[in-house]
Amino acid sequence: MDLLKKEYTGITYISGPLLFVENAKDLAYGAIVDIKDGTGRVRGGQVIEVSEEYAVIQVFEETTGLDLATTSVSLVEDVARLGVSKEMLGRRFNGIGKPIDGLPPITPEKRLPITGLPLNPVARRKPEQFIQTGISTIDVMNTLVRGQKLPIFSGSGLPANEIAAQIARQATVRPDLSGEGEKEEPFAVVFAAMGITQRELSYFIQEFERTGALSRSVLFLNKADDPTIERILTPRMALTVAEYLAFEHDYHVLVILTDMTNYCEALREIGAAREEIPGRRGYPGYMYTDLATIYERAGVVEGKKGSVTQIPILSMPDDDRTHPIPDLTGYITEGQIQLSRELHRKGIYPPIDPLPSLSRLMNNGVGKGKTREDHKQVSDQLYSAYANGVDIRKLVAIIGEDALTENDRRYLQFADAFERFFINQGQQNRSIEESLQIAWALLSMLPQGELKRISKDHIGKYYGQKLEEIWGAPQALD
């Protein structure tokens, strides 16, 4: 600790959560500062803009009680840093990394900048190992791969929080079966919630504790009534811990970020306070770049055994996929999982619609030695058959079911069964083998001649499974 600290007293203007300081030439962008008022109370803050005339500081707490004459600013750290340690597993922190579980502070092994360390693009390896989420629609049709960034597009009132908690509880890495031996690899979940209500906070804490998932997880929980700047820091805090566990301790880390819409709203709020020229729908023009600094921290690095995988979750305002937040997220990430309001109305959980969903890296992480040799062909056939069934369902609404051919009726029956037994799994944790077994039972409802996307070898090996044999009759298609 420095014995002498330089204090800046030239506070010229206070606007909402922002402080404007004159002649602060030693303050750099991103620096962490202490702000002391006339009563001696100290608040934290971060430098978010620097010019020749002044520095702009975002205060981490409310600015009530600050006045121009008695307020002073002193430098704490050159950039925002987080003390990290393996002790963080099993712990809960607020949005800026302070413990909120009643336990003592951790003893940090390192203090790392929350913006992340520069990564040579050439050092990145191609993601190609499967992560099992236990959710059939994701594992079979939109496979998550280690090092991938795969967002979930939700909407108001859809069960995104429940799906986030379920993935955090069930997700696991599977050994590479193509190698010699099957060594268990360490796996951890870093969960960051931004702008959540007290009810949502209680739900996440109870779910992690009730299911035992907390022991392998690190939680960062930013509440809706916490300072706006905390929402900007929270995902970066989470990713700093994830990178440390992955690249220092060889963990495969799954980072779940919810809700990125609240993060972007915080960006817009800060931009308005700084009187920046707004971009699309009032969001800052640099939002694409800002989101990229978060999403691009996923990956696998040459020479490192660990990996960082991201599942950002965002709520689409008015279910609009062209809204700037899902639109820009889609440009940066590698696919999307789309939640369906129609499936949700039918009581189907999780209401994941496979047709608009996509995992661009799926082909890298499936097949013999990774999942199963028939995986990709089964996925393609499920897409084709379900899409056909959905089209026929729309046709029935116009001309009625009497005009359908026998083959059309099979596809219609397939679509109904697919939603009921494959998509609608509730809180069940399914292995990839169980999911593929259900998929084959559903595909066996169709004539073999209709399975044009599956090889004859695979049809001969797996075709003929009955739903009744999986669930024990007679519930299959009653």
From Swiss-Prot:
- Any one GO molecular-function label of the UniProt entry: proton-transporting ATP synthase activity, rotational mechanism
Protein's job:
Produces ATP from ADP in the presence of a proton gradient across the membrane. The V-type beta chain is a regulatory subunit.
Write out the similarity annotation. Belongs to the ATPase alpha/beta chains family.
Classification via CDD domains: ATP-synt_V_A-type_beta_C (cd18112), ATP-synt_V_A-type_beta_N (cd18118), V_A-ATPase_B (cd01135)
> What name appears for this protein in its UniProt entry?
V-type ATP synthase beta chain
Lineage: superkingdom:
Bacteria
Keyword Ion transport carried by entry: yes
What's any GO biological process attached to this entry?
proton motive force-driven plasma membrane ATP synthesis
Matching InterPro entries:
ATP-synt_VA_C, ATPase_a/bsu_AS, ATPase_F1/V1/A1_a/bsu_N, ATPase_F1/V1/A1_a/bsu_nucl-bd, P-loop_NTPase, V-ATPase_su_B/beta
Q: Which UniProt keywords apply?
A: ATP synthesis, Hydrogen ion transport, Ion transport, Transport
* Keyword Ion transport among UniProt keywords: yes
Q: Which SUPFAM superfamilies match?
A: C-terminal domain of alpha and beta subunits of F1 ATP synthase, P-loop containing nucleoside triphosphate hydrolases
Q: Which HAMAP family match?
A: ATP_synth_B_arch (MF_00310)
